[in-house]
Amino acid sequence: MVSQLVLEEQTVTTLERPTPLAAEQPALEIVGALKRFHKDEGQKKAFWKRGERKPRELTIAVDHMTITVPRGEIFGLLGANGSGKSTLIRLVSTLLIPDGGEIRVFGHDVRREERLVRRLINRVSVEASFFKKLSALENLMYAARLYDMPIGEARQRAIYILGKLGMKEQRLYEPLENMSRGMQQKIAVARGLLTSPVLLLLDEPTTGLDPRSKQDVQRFILRMRREHDTTVFLTTHDMDEADRLCDRIAVIDDGKIVALDTPEGLKRQIGAQSGKNGSATMEDVFLALTGKSLDDDFEVEGDAVAEEE
């Protein structure tokens, strides 16, 4: 039976950390991060003389970004499609290798200490993958085994999180292939929260969710920060979400940071420049700093390039 949906929050335990974490240690340090890709020009392959090599154009997705995120902060990346925000998340999560600069998670380098970093983080992405024939609960239990969570604790916590995210008891055993994309995204968020990571990487976590489901996810993110000292590093297309959740926001454009401040600080700055003192919105901020709409499509395509520093 799934009567555990009504468990009190204090009964839910968390994974033991791999190493003690100093309170004064920044959760995330990004120093001059660089990532380049080969640009796909969409042209047919041409014949070249033997021994000659066709030059491949490079594009910079992350252009020497520097960010420090203190422990316990919710830090947001706001940018149009192709601005580099998802690439930066993948660099932090060790899914991509930086071509330059340094990235450290609680002092651990993402290249030299990859396994330690992965024990401290969890990532939720809009393109999350699942075993579609399995239920929500079975997918979360599988993820828990990868993190060596005790079965009883994992089941208890999975049921608790799914309940808090608004999943009804009778749907816990339903195959994911029968669920909407929005419901599957909720399960992706639950999977990311399952191990109570000390650094939670959220790549557009509420994309595809209805307004009530968005609020459920946002409330749980705030609860994770409050109760488990979780640091959150997120990308979003949702201006209201960035304003509501984030302690600080970096606006990025073409792989570069064009502004970094609190939501109120950014709105004051743009409001003073535009004559909208006290009435500027995050949309005003974004348009003023980038000249783009968040719906503009500038996605970078191609193969990753690993070059020597």
Can you name each region flagged by the protein language model?
Residues 260-261:
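ABC ATPase "signature
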Residues 200-203:
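Catalytic Walker B motif of ABC-type/P-loop ATPase nucleotide-binding domains
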Residues 196:
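Conserved catalytic motifs of ABC-family nucleotide-binding domains
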Residues 215-228:
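Helical segment within the ABC ATPase nucleotide-binding domain
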